[in-house]
Regions:
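Signature of N-terminal electron-transfer/Fe-S-associated modules in redox systems
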Residues: 26-140
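Conserved N-terminal glycine-rich FAD pyrophosphate-binding loop of Rossmann-like flavoproteins
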Residues: 174-196
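Rossmann-like dinucleotide/flavin-binding elements
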Residues: 132-172, 255-322
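Short hydrophobic targeting helices and cationic amphipathic motifs
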Residues: 5, 11-14, 18-19, 65
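Short beta-strand to alpha-helix junction loop
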Residues: 188-205, 322-323
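Cysteine-centered iron-sulfur cluster-binding motifs in ferredoxin-type domains/subunits
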Residues: 54-59, 83-92, 146-149, 153-158, ...
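FAD-binding core/adjacent interface of flavoenzyme oxidoreductases
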Residues: 78-81, 100-145, 201-290
Length: 323
């Protein structure tokens, strides 16, 4: 057993006595922030398991439920509580019934939602038949297709434009910028041109694509790569399929967080940095006020710093390689 495993063992002992009930009381909406401007777009009330919950328009169901003190979205086959996992719509851990349809609440806005409930054997079956729709499928043609509108994808788009090549960028999110949208700190001068040094991450995200966003398809996901240099894309907002034909394909889909396994790593209140940053900096929701950070690298320190900006208290930063 290595030192990291020993440290995780200590962490498991700490989490063994963790109470989700305690964390429920200290989840809150962020109303003041020293860096970010918090928009006020009105409120919307929906029913969650029969109880009224009010959330901010333009923000997700997950944010509304956590702010209302409901971090549990599902249960395992053994009855264990389940909560957010990736927080960016990739894993399906937060799937719930939203007005009768299965949706991932970490990316589904509260706007116009009437009822949300946990998916159970009693309230959901897969016997329903989907009627095929005979609709013409649009085909877009370009030089290069780019999957991902984060820093890498947008940098590729910019370079291709300088070379005189056309491109189409496809991203499943509702905004461009990827992880830069979650970063409130000022970046160092890390590139030769010194274009972005000193700028905060979310400001870099606004400038990466310039003023011309043509050829960028948001709310869309690539679900198949076909023959004849064609990819199949689903417009998740309008529920339509379309094709993109390109001479080359660039995959710039970013990364997903790694969660080392330890006892009770699935307890609501134990989250990856990606979930914490997304809920905090994009959804203005603190998942807790008293924080223990596991990992003292770049991400651990930055997330802890951002949590302190948002009003949380970081009690300790846990290093797996510490003596």
């Amino acid at each position: 057993m290595n030192r990291f495993q020993v440290k995780l063992g200590h962490l498991s002992n700490y989490i063994r006595n963790f109470s989700p009930i305690k964390s429920i009381a200290i989840m809150e909406r962020i109303v003041n922030h020293p860096i970010l401007t918090i928009p006020q777009e009105g409120e919307h009330t929906f029913l969650f398991n029969g109880k009224p919950v009010t959330g901010m328009k333009g923000f997700t169901i997950a944010a509304a439920l956590h702010q209302a003190g409901y971090p549990v979205h599902s249960h395992s086959v053994n009855g264990r509580n389940r909560s957010l996992n990736c927080g960016i719509g990739k894993c399906g851990a937060c799937e719930m019934l939203v007005d009768g349809e299965v949706k991932r609440i970490c990316i589904t806005k509260v706007d116009n939602v009437k009822e949300v409930s946990e998916i159970t054997v009693q309230n959901y079956t897969t016997d329903s038949q989907i009627e095929p729709r005979e609709e013409p499928v649009e085909i877009y043609r370009t030089d290069v297709a780019i999957i991902g509108a984060g820093p890498a994808g947008l940098a590729c788009r910019e370079t291709l434009k300088e070379l005189g090549l056309n491109s189409i960028v496809i991203d499943s999110n509702d905004k461009i910028g990827g992880q830069f949208l979650m970063q409130t700190h000022a970046f160092f001068f890390f590139e030769k041109e010194r274009r972005f040094g000193g700028m905060r991450g979310f400001d870099i995200a606004k400038t990466l694509a310039g003023d011309d966003h043509s050829g960028i398809f948001l709310h869309s996901t690539v679900w198949d790569i076909l023959q004849n240099k064609r990819i199949a894309v689903k417009d998740m907002l309008n529920h339509k399929n379309f094709y993109v034909e390109a001479q080359a394909l660039i995959v710039a889909t970013g990364a997903v967080p790694f969660m080392p396994t330890f006892e009770n790593d699935d307890v609501p209140g134990v989250y990856t940095a990606a979930v914490v940053q997304k809920m905090m900096n994009a959804e203005f929701t603190l998942l807790g006020k008293n924080i223990l950070t596991v990992g003292a690298g770049n991400i651990g320190y930055l997330t802890s710093y951002q949590l302190m900006q948002a009003g949380a208290k970081v009690k300790a930063i846990f290093r797996g390689d510490a003596p």
